[in-house]
Amino acid sequence: LTTADPITFRKTLNSLSNAGIENVAFEASSHGLFQRRLGDVKVKSAAFTSFSQDHLEYHQTMDGYLQAKLILFTENLIDGEEAVINSEIMFFDFIRSFLLEKNIPFCTVGNNGDVKIKRNKQSLEGQSICLEYKGKKYEFETNIIGSFQAINLLIAAKLVSNLGVEFDQIIEKLPEIEAVPGRLQRITSAENEYQVFVDYAHTPDALEKSLQELKKLKKKPGNLYVVFGCGGDRDTLKRPIMGKIASEIADKVIITDDNPRTEDPRKIRGQIAEAAVEAEEIADRKSAIIDTIAKLRKDDILLIAGKGHEDYQIIGKERFKFSDIEIARKAVQKV
């Protein structure tokens, strides 16, 4: 769970306050919002970073999922304070209309946002970004890879500016920010002939974005590989969708186990494979990662998707120590 119950959450905030912490950033999960786990906590600013098919085993419909997320802005955002919205996300027009109807001030971030990304030059080393905000142009470089991560970075910058920090000062500091572990994290170095990335992408939208970003960076005649699975006891509808996305964008698809939990992992892999043309199945995730890395050649790129920063794998009701990042690092060193 990413959002604690109201009492625990309040205790945590009180402890941070007693320790002299004046500003806190936290994730408000859709489950937590729907169950009112934030209680009466009010926030100075709130952001809507992404929205795509996920958690339908709980929310049942996309509309139910969206309405749960919007609770943050109607119940927990201080009246008159600003929401920050990713202008590139699914249902943006609906979200925009909703905020206008509720008289909630908002700022948009994206290719056509109030914080407007004018140019974004990508490389395996990071990206160079040119943006415009309130008539002023800014440029900076970051080692964080992926245009969608550039939007997240600028959303975070706008949230901080809403706390009273000058936007110019924030932009100056952005090059110092390191990539979040497991978010298009590069395992290899520039010296490697091939490249390996680990990403948390576990939804159709996230998988598509990560694969598209890496496809743009791939040099010919290299191939784009993807190793991924889907979690058990979770949304089953997304499995064939993710299989289709993987097979349409990647050159080589390897279906493996994610966190099967109490579901039959063969069934999960089969549902993904329904729409994944010519995909290979390797049930054991560690073997799938190691075997695929051993096959990589010059200019190939591998995306290991689904678990990202996680340091465990759930099989049945047991949690085992497991890290895509560590396994990939060791495999790269051995090749």
Task: Outline where the language-model segments fall.
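Conserved helix/coil segment N-terminal to the catalytic DExD/H
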Residues: 31-39
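Short glycine-rich, flexible loops that bind phosphorylated cofactors or substrates
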Residues: 32-33, 55, 92, 262, ...
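Inter-motif core of Ras-like GTPase G domains
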Residues: 39-51, 219-227
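ATP-dependent carboxylate-amine ligase
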Residues: 104, 155-182, 186-335
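Acidic, Mg2+-coordinating active-site environments of NTP-dependent enzymes
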Residues: 19-22, 43-196, 273-275
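Short beta-strand segments
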Residues: 27, 50, 86, 227-229, ...
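Conserved nucleotide-sensing/catalytic segment adjacent to the nucleotide-binding pocket
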Residues: 1-29
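Amphipathic alpha-helical transducer elements in NTP-driven molecular machines
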Residues: 3-10, 59, 66, 150-153, ...
